Amino acid sequence: SPINISVHTTNPELRRKMINNKFAGKLMDTMRRLAEAGIEMNAQIVLCPGYNDKKELERTLEDLASLRPYVHSAAIVPVGITRYRDNLAKLEIFDEKSASETIDQIHKLQEKYLEELGTRFAFLSDEFHIIAKRPLLKYDEYEGFLQFEDGVGMIRKMGTEVVEYLKTINDDRLNKTKKVSIATGKSAYEFMCNMAEEIMTKFKNIEINVYRIKNNFFGETITVSGLLTATDLIDQLKNKDLGETLYITRSMMKADEEIFLDNITLKELEEKLNIEVIPCQNEGIDVVDKITK
């Protein structure tokens, strides 16, 4: 499978400045060598307004596209600013206007690449669409969700899976009675509410409360669910009506262990909230199965 490369920009001087590393400007040479060796890559770009966006972003994508087919795709995610920024460069975050401008820019480039390369090549994470209050791409336009782990098309994929899977369920589970809750970050909150509605429409006796959790640990501008900590879950859910089970995304925990980013374990979270907590994969079928079992 392709290796993931954090690109951010292919402008050598700008990359040295952004990464604060005097060797960071040699990225394109390295990627060319990898391509010549037949190694396949996916590129990630964390976009920072006023630094590597607009013209710089176009330059970066053109450089990366020149390495097709070895560079499969480029994922673009908006910068998130934590509250730990003493002595660091001043950064802005995307707002509705700047996110919308970025969507327009990428749509134009996608059309061009589709014509020239047979692929849209550059994909924005769902966060851009949420910030800009604009619709996501259609399911097929994500071309197999090459950068799903970077949050590119995650909402479209999960939403489609939930709707399609619910149509196929016709068994004893439909009579199940239970009350449960879901905890999620700000960016996925609206989607999770819609998903809960879909499930409750099909399962008349299941009640789901969705709770939006603010990221006080890293800072409020960090809105993705995967960066929420157990501390924030405990602080914001401790006196809430959670029903019999709380569901969270598995991505809140470290890859191979049930520990949150603040080093609290899943078991400790369950003890503090006095409730069973079930992590779900970012897959529609897994979420529905776990909630309705």
Model regions and ranges:
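Radical SAM enzyme core and accessory elements
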Residues: K133-K293
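Conserved, mostly hydrophobic/aromatic
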Residues: I5, A74, L246
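Short acidic, glycine/serine/threonine-rich loops at helix termini
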Residues: R15-I19, K55-L57, R85-K90, R134-L137
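Charged helix-capping and loop-helix junction motifs
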Residues: F23-G25, E58-R59, L261-T265
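A general structural motif
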Residues: P2, G38-E40, V71, T119, ...
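Short secondary-structure subsegments characteristic of cysteine-rich extracellular domains
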Residues: N87-D104, K112, F260-E276
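Conserved glycine-rich "GG(E/T)P / GGGxP" loop and the immediately following alpha-helix
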Residues: H8-M28, C48-E56
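Conserved C-terminal portion of the radical SAM core fold
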Residues: T30-N87, K97-E127
